[in-house]
Amino acid sequence: MRYPFFAMVCFCVLIAPSRAADAPYVTTPQNVIDAMLKISKVAAADYVIDLGSGDGRVVITAAKSLGARGMGVELDANLVRTATRNAQREGVQDRVSFYKDDLFFADLSKATVITMYMSESVNLRLRPSLFKLKPGTRVVSHDFDMAQWTPDEKMTVPVPNKPYGQPKSDIFLWVVPADFSGAWTWRIPIAGINQEHEARFEQKFQVAEGKGRVASRAVPVGNVQIRGDTISFVMGATVDGKTTWRDFRGRISDDTITGSVFTVVEGDAVNKSQEPVVWRATRTARGKMIIDAATEFVDEDKVAALFLTKEQQ
């Protein structure tokens, strides 16, 4: 169902950090908001925080259409008052709230979903704060990415009457990854003998590489995947002349992983040759997840060009 109130949306777009206080509004159609909420899978259990919330329509849409709760962070006190009135008018004042605050200092800890429409340079300044959020928190950005932190998902929606750039909008989704870096140990049976396993992982954003050892022998580790607090990887070993791959899947909580391991023997007719067994690993040494933006470059001329009107282009 469509609501006239949500026909068009104005986002506070931060062209550069120095302009955060006087950023212009750019009109955004409802289909972009719908796509942002869809790609981040917003549901009634979520708490949505919109950074640069303007008149509040992203959070209000999430509350009215999807039953979510949330808040907006906005520097302009007049817009905060407008957003509060709009929430009352739409009957969601008990589910949403709006605050005048600097987005770089706002408390984001309650968020399960962060929405934003800011320049890449501002995104990069925000990135360290986003990595402090609980693993699994979804971050969705309209039109601007986060340089070396590649999105987990991306979609493009048509915007025929967009007042700047191309007649489309890119929407990026990131899932805040758990810190999987460091050394992990565990024991599982191999050929009937409980064997000591060790794996060491280096991680940059949600991408990791590992090296493994089984009973002091080096073994390959590959296909490492991290999404929120869930991880998976495979570890190889040779047993009775056959290559055996173990598929580890689990969930991280601080320095512990709990999950299951499947065993696949090379040449088996079936994909999983054994029933999964419980797997529990302990981190014995912490690493350092790399999230440094110091070497990343943002082309502000390119950013500014995106906001040229059709008449200016």
Across the structure, where does each feature detected by a protein language model lie?
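Conserved alpha-helix/loop element of class I SAM-dependent methyltransferases that forms part
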Residues: 27-45
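C-terminal substrate-binding/active-site "lid" region of AdoMet-derived donor-dependent transferases
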Residues: 123-179
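Conserved class I S-adenosyl-L-methionine
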Residues: 44-54
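Glycine-rich SAM-binding Motif I of class I
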Residues: 56-60
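A short SAM/SAH-binding and catalytic strip from SAM-dependent methyltransferases
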Residues: 109-125
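S-adenosyl-L-methionine
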Residues: 77-110
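Central antiparallel beta-sheet cores of small beta-barrel/beta-sandwich binding domains
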Residues: 178-277, 299-310
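Conserved SAM-binding motif I beta-strand of class I
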Residues: 69-74
